[in-house]
Amino acid sequence: WLFPHRGTELYSDKPPMLMWLQAAFYTVTGNWRVAFLLPSLLAALGTLWCVQDLAGRLWTRRVGLYAAWALLFAFQFTWQAKKAQIDPLVTFFITLANYGLLRHLLLGPAWRWWALGWAAAGLGTITKGVGALALLMVLPAAIAAVRGWPRVRVHARDRRFWLGPLAFLGAVSVWLVPVLAVALSQDLPEYRAYLDDILLRQTAKRYSQSWDHHQPAWYHLGVMASMWIPAVLALPWAIPAWRRRLRRRDPRYLLPLAWWLLVLVFFSIPDGKRDVYIMPALPMMCLALAPLLPGILRRRLPRALLLALALLVALLFLAGGASVLSGVGSLPERLREQRGLDPQGIVAGGWMLLAIGAWGLGCVLAFRRRAVAALSATLAGLWVVFGLVGYGLLNDASSARGVMAAAGRRIGPEAELGLVAWKEQNLLMADRPAATFGFKRPWDEQLQLAVAWQAQAPDRWLLVLEDALEHCLDPQRIELAGISNRRRWYLVPPDAVVAPCEATPEERARAAAGQARDLEE
């Protein structure tokens, strides 16, 4: 529980909060798929509630509903909420922290909410280090209070102010104190390395000296413009309105907008950037945008823009479905080569795309005078159909389930299996205990250890990623196990090793490049 493992190695990329929740839900449900998805689902629902309730308290109940709908239909939010990843959870804790802080700063004094906000930031920190960014909300509030803005107070002179920092330390200590106590008492080098990695390398060093996901400084502007659709389409009308309200010194706009700007600057400074990094700022954008949406949506041009977006989505899916079913274009080939879909799966995928496109076109025609309804219905149909049909079609290709099932059938129930250049899902979805030879260890060294392990007993097989194959393996004897996550996996039987596995410079460079790419993902 304190030190999760990835195979035989300690997992120090992230604190274990997400894994705690998944393990707890597995204890309750006994189903790994449900246990993996529940944290993201509940976190997304919690984020929606925070935004809806806070907007309702700061303005009106109707504004709260606008804020929640804007967030729900933002592409990045919905996409991530349907995946078993850490980002919806950290977004929830940051949003909950913002909720508590704003309840105190704008509607307070409310010391319980103040303490809850800091505690949520602490829980966000032991989920993913950036959870503490929620506390930046105090900075614009303090500046506004000093400059005499109405209806905003930090109440820093009150002794109860320190309940917040204490709550933050208490939440962080839930994980940090026992981890430090156990690691320092063990006096084992792997535990010291774990502390160095998770407390220093994965935080300060990753920020100051990013070694992966290199992107230009303006990268997150493109992410927001493309992945925060449709809410972001209102910005040309919202920005002048925000400017007017800031001139009137309305802190309800200043605090979420200033915090959004601070988060954007924070994530734009390092070279390493990913699209999900900026997602925790999306709820605050929707909060500040919501009071303006009723007026913006009464304008003709914004409504035309939303209707055009719905039509574009429908036409793109219709074109994609027609391409897949007719075999014209590169899409069918990509589904076959990169996703490993069989002909039946490709045909089913084509009909799914056509169904989504037809639904969208029908929504545009039925609600052509109600652009918001047309786009909302189109996006709702897209997510429902894709969730019910698309995930089933792509499950084997987007996870290791298909490859591991095929490998298990091929080698038989009595054989042993070793993994080289593996991902966590390979180990999870294997139908038997599998031998591993390190995760961060270079792939060529993994292969050497795996071949030595294979030679120690009969009926041992290796599952090897294509980029980790070397000249020591007879290409006529290895077998393609399948394709998952756009990668080809090969089974290596005992008689396929025909020479010592000493990687050539070209093989070592190819493996190193592939491993770096995998670690970036």
Task: State where each predicted segment sits.
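Membrane-interface transmembrane helices that cradle and orient dolichyl/undecaprenyl
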Residues: 57-58, 62, 97-116, 124, ...
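Transmembrane-helix signature of polytopic, membrane-embedded enzymes
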Residues: 51-73
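Short acidic/glycine- and proline-prone juxtamembrane loop motifs at membrane-interface regions
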Residues: 37-40, 79-90
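Transmembrane-helix motifs of polytopic, lipid-linked glycan transferases
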Residues: 38-58, 96
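Specific aromatic-rich, kink-prone transmembrane helix
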Residues: 50, 90-107, 285-288
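Extracytosolic helix-loop segments that constitute the early lumenal/periplasmic catalytic or substrate-binding loops
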Residues: 1-10, 17-20, 24
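Short periplasmic/luminal acceptor-recognition loop of GT-C membrane glycosyltransferases, typified by
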Residues: 352-359, 370-494, 508-520
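Transmembrane-lumen/periplasm boundary regions of multi-pass, lipid-linked membrane glycan transferases
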Residues: 119-120, 132-275, 284, 291, ...
